[in-house]
Amino acid sequence: MKVLIIGGGASGLMAALSAAEEGYAVTLVERQGRVGRKLLATGNGRCNLTNTGADSPRYHGAAPAFVRPALARFGVRRTLEFFRTLGLLTVEEADGKVYPLSDQASSVLDVLRFAVEQRGVRIAGSCDIVEVKKKARGYEAIAATGEKFFGDKLIICCGGCAGKRLGGVKSGYFLLGQLGHRCTALYPCLTQIKTDPTWVKALKGIRADAQLSLRRGGAVLQEEAGEIQFTDFGVSGPVAFALSRAAATGGEGLRLVLDFFRGYGAPELAAFFRARRESFPALPAEELLSGSLQSRLGKTLLKRAGVAAGGTLGAVTDAEIEKLCNLAKHFPLEVLGVMGFDSAQVTAGGMDVSEFRADTLESCLAPGVFAAGEVLDIDGDCGGFNLQWAWSSGYVAGKAGKIEAI
């Protein structure tokens, strides 16, 4: 049987290896000159290839439970065993994140490329597929150059439109659309959040530990804690990335509320700053937060709280301290949106999973067509979850309808 795979990213490479393992004749068509380019950029060049906590609650979309059969069939344990057989050693870090022992994403791509070559997979690079057609037997894919490819089974692994610089495109959505499939709304995900720049411009480049709450009115939509980084347009860092999906899909009227003292209550903070005022009354007022926060961040809080910069600590009133503490615990920023697909790591949304079988990833509309990875309406949390979905779904799709005992 001939298997044709369109897309040479993580899910496409896994699908190729999985299909070749069955003895199928596999052709992998990739739009770019080389396969796996996005892998080299994951995890800041380290490749966070999975997470030991990968399970359906860490995934999103219209039907997150869709991931369960694939994760049960080829989960974290089997993924790590698979990579070990290819010659890759790994190390588990905080929060269940797994990286190659070499600390280099190139190690992951290398072992995949070597395995693909060894198993006889034909790779057609620099080949942009623009059309797929159902034939009397199987499917035909036509490139922009006019070149044609055939497969008894067709697997679409084109990924999403995030990370355009690294090859993110919408081609997978268009190709599956030609076969009758529906695409949901698409949003940039795992990216920076844009806010009103009034108070963040002066903080550009500053890193801080904080709790971030995404809110609409009095309702908290999502809350995360950890390191953030201010930019001239808003907030970045792992915590902002974790909130970006909700910020992208949540519509208007959203705001971020930052807590820079998440280990302390406002009354405790107020008592601490009153004691500092009494101990050092002659110090400039702008030094009130100098032992607690980065200098520019502290001065921004003082300015927003209305504490006069030219005075002394002794002149700061109890009311000003109370206002400052409330602001330090509830620093509001109006959300203007998120950065676009160029900056995003993942696409939220994709092909409607109700039109695919969860156990095989075969199309319910076009028998013999399968889809895997980011092209489907599944996206995971930051921390290796999206790559695990790529491995799991690629493996299952590569079996081309063959169901193994779990």
Regions found by a protein language model. Name each.
Residues 4-6, 29, 129, 148-165, ...:
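Short hydrophobic core segments
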Residues 20-44:
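Glycine-rich FAD pyrophosphate-binding loop
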Residues 44-92:
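Glycine-rich active-site loop/strand segments that organize a redox cofactor
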Residues 124-125, 298-379:
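A glycine-rich dinucleotide-binding beta-alpha-beta segment and adjacent secondary-structure elements
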Residues 125-138:
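A conserved short coil-to-beta-strand element within the FAD-binding core of flavoproteins
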Residues 153-199:
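Glycine-rich loop(s) and the adjacent beta-strand/alpha-helix scaffold that form part
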